[in-house]
Amino acid sequence: MNKKIGAIGEQLAVHYLKNKGYRILDCNYRTRLGEIDIIAILNDTIVFVEVKTRSSGAFGTPSEAVNYKKQMTIRRVSQQYLLSNRIGEDDWNLRFDVIEVQLIEKKYKINHMENAF
C-alpha cells in the first residue's frame, strides 16, 4: 500500500474518532516490536486502533489484513505502551478496534469495528 494513502486513512480515522468523542493520546506509536496507529481514550477505556485503508478492492477488505499475527503484535505493543506510560491495566478497560477506510474517488467510507479482537 502507498504510504500516502495510509496516512490519509489515518488522518480520516483520527477526525472520525474525535467527532465521536474520543481523546487521542498518540498516533503511530512505535517500538521495536511494532506499531499502533492510534491510541485513544473514550470514557474509562483505552482504545488501541489499527487503521486499514484501501483505494480499491483488489486486496480484499481492509480488515482482512488484520490477521492473527498482526493482532498479537498490536497486543504486545499495547502492553509496552501501558508499561512505558505507567498506566495500570486495573485502572482502565482496554479495547482493540479496527477502522477500515475505503477511498472511492474523492469520497471515503469508514467502518469502525469496536472490540475487533
UniProtKB/Swiss-Prot annotation:
<comment type="similarity">
    <text>Belongs to the UPF0102 family.</text>
</comment>
<dbReference type="InterPro" id="IPR003509">
    <property type="entry name" value="UPF0102_YraN-like"/>
</dbReference>
<protein>
    <recommendedName>
        <fullName>UPF0102 protein Clos_1471</fullName>
    </recommendedName>
</protein>
<dbReference type="InterPro" id="IPR011335">
    <property type="entry name" value="Restrct_endonuc-II-like"/>
</dbReference>
<dbReference type="InterPro" id="IPR011856">
    <property type="entry name" value="tRNA_endonuc-like_dom_sf"/>
</dbReference>
<dbReference type="GO" id="GO:0003676">
    <property type="term" value="F:nucleic acid binding"/>
</dbReference>
<dbReference type="Pfam" id="PF02021">
    <property type="entry name" value="UPF0102"/>
</dbReference>
